[in-house]
Curated annotation (Swiss-Prot):
GO cellular component: photosystem II; plasma membrane-derived thylakoid membrane
Swiss-Prot/TrEMBL site (Cleavage) positions: 344-345
Membrane topology: Multi-pass membrane protein
Function: Photosystem II (PSII) is a light-driven water:plastoquinone oxidoreductase that uses light energy to abstract electrons from H(2)O, generating O(2) and a proton gradient subsequently used for ATP formation. It consists of a core antenna complex that captures photons, and an electron transfer chain that converts photonic excitation into a charge separation. The D1/D2 (PsbA/PsbD) reaction center heterodimer binds P680, the primary electron donor of PSII as well as several subsequent electron acceptors.
Subunit structure as annotated in this protein's UniProt entry: PSII is composed of 1 copy each of membrane proteins PsbA, PsbB, PsbC, PsbD, PsbE, PsbF, PsbH, PsbI, PsbJ, PsbK, PsbL, PsbM, PsbT, PsbX, PsbY, PsbZ, Psb30/Ycf12, peripheral proteins PsbO, CyanoQ (PsbQ), PsbU, PsbV and a large number of cofactors. It forms dimeric complexes.
PANTHER family named among the record's database cross-references: PHOTOSYSTEM II D2 PROTEIN, PHOTOSYSTEM II PROTEIN D1
Record keywords: Calcium, Chlorophyll, Chromophore, Electron transport, Herbicide resistance, Iron, Magnesium, Manganese, Membrane, Metal-binding, Oxidoreductase, Photosynthesis, Photosystem II, Thylakoid, Transmembrane, Transmembrane helix, Transport
Residues that hold chlorophyll a ChlzD1 according to the record: 118
Note in the entry: Cyanobacteria usually contain more than 2 copies of the psbA gene. 2 of the reaction center chlorophylls (ChlD1 and ChlD2) are entirely coordinated by water.
Name of the protein described by the UniProt record: Photosystem II protein D1 2
Binding positions (pheophytin a): 126
């Protein structure tokens, strides 16, 4: 008689947990980045919803003049926002346990810091989770690279800009009109419209929208007929089919004749790389622009660039923009200061209008 002994293959609880976390068979992939992403995004979302609805007014400027931001304190869906933490807090980390009471924490805008820090950690981990799932499936890593653009933009306005300005009270307000207020004040203080990196960001967003519309309409217009006139053309595609569902040669020929030959891609892979890269690079530059202006390396200043023979200024559009910027600057934070820095800097220093003559 032969006896066979075999050790039982029983994985311990930790190994089973690891297998479940990293399994690509789950309906939603979790991953190790997801272990951090899920609780942080949940915390940010729950706090945002509660604060947006019911947070009491916040002393944003640190001068004991609270600003109401929530729906229950008189705002509507357009004007409501989570108001940034107080200028009295500055760049200090302000968790709940650092305040003397919950009322003090709310008055100083503590929920804003809780939301943005958890949100930023969450989207960083979402980007890492994209890479992790791509790695597990044997895919190339360009999806998280593309997502790095909005991550960089969010990091710029929620973290880098407040660090450069010295206070989280200067961060992006979490609401609709609050976002517009941030944009307008940013223009007044940094002249962002005259910054080349912002211009590249505009080209990236508008160009990306244009290219997406062009690509979608070209493909839709050159579908290979698989259905009758009475059926939807969408039924002509079966998920996972090997053959192309549209005629790229026809699309290339059309667009090459509409513009010129070399404006049209004849390689599907390079085309789709271009469609991804254009808006991503543009938004990277926009985020870089915010991050440099955070430290007051501002947009171009062409004020008083044109003068006549008597030295009188001939206004250009740059001067019109400058006057608008100063007007906006004197209106915002109306009780925090009397004059903007541009007006409080003293008399203008004279500059030479002509080169001095050089004696031999």
């Amino acid at each position: 008689m032969t006896t066979v002994l075999q050790r039982r293959q029983t994985a311990n609880l930790w190994e089973r947990f690891c297998d479940w976390i990293t399994s690509t068979e789950n309906r939603l992939y979790i991953g190790w980045f997801g272990v951090i992403m899920i609780p942080t995004l949940l915390a940010a979302t729950i706090c945002f919803v509660i604060a947006f609805i019911a947070a009491p007014p916040v002393d944003i400027d640190g001068i004991r003049e609270p600003v109401s931001g929530s729906l229950l304190y008189g705002n509507n869906i357009i004007t409501a926002a989570v108001v940034p933490s107080s200028n009295a807090i500055g760049l200090h980390l302000y968790p709940i346990w650092d305040a003397a009471s919950l009322d003090e924490w709310l008055y100083n805008g503590g929920p804003y810091q809780l939301i943005i820090f958890h949100f930023l950690i969450g989207i960083f981990c979402y980007m890492g989770r994209e890479w992790e799932l791509s790695y597990r499936l044997g895919m190339r890593p360009w999806i998280p690279v593309a997502f790095s653009a909005p991550v960089a933009a969010a990091t710029a306005v929620l973290l880098i800009y407040p660090i450069g300005q010295g206070s989280f009270s200067d961060g992006l307000m979490l609401g609709i009109s609050g976002t517009f207020n941030f944009m307008i004040v940013f223009q007044a203080e940094h002249n962002i419209l005259m910054h080349p990196f912002h211009m590249l960001g505009v080209a990236g967003v508008f160009g990306g929208a244009l290219f997406a519309a062009m690509h979608g309409s070209l493909v839709t217009s050159s579908l290979i007929r698989e259905t009758t006139e009475t059926e939807s053309t969408n039924y002509g595609y079966k998920f996972g089919q090997e053959e192309e569902t549209y005629n790229i040669v026809a699309a290339h020929g059309y667009f090459g004749r509409l513009i010129f030959q070399y404006a049209s891609f004849n390689n599907s892979r390079s085309l789709h790389f271009f469609l991804a890269a254009w808006p991503v690079v543009g938004i990277w530059f926009a985020a870089l622009g915010i991050s440099t202006m955070a430290f007051n390396l501002n947009g171009f200043n062409f004020n008083h660039s044109v003068v006549d023979a008597q030295g009188n200024v001939i206004n250009t559009w740059a001067d019109i923009i400058n006057r608008a910027n100063i007007g906006i600057e004197v209106m915002h934070e109306r009780n925090a200061h009397n004059f903007p820095l541009d007006l409080a800097s003293g008399e203008l220093a004279p500059v030479a209008m002509i080169a001095p003559s050089i004696e031999a």
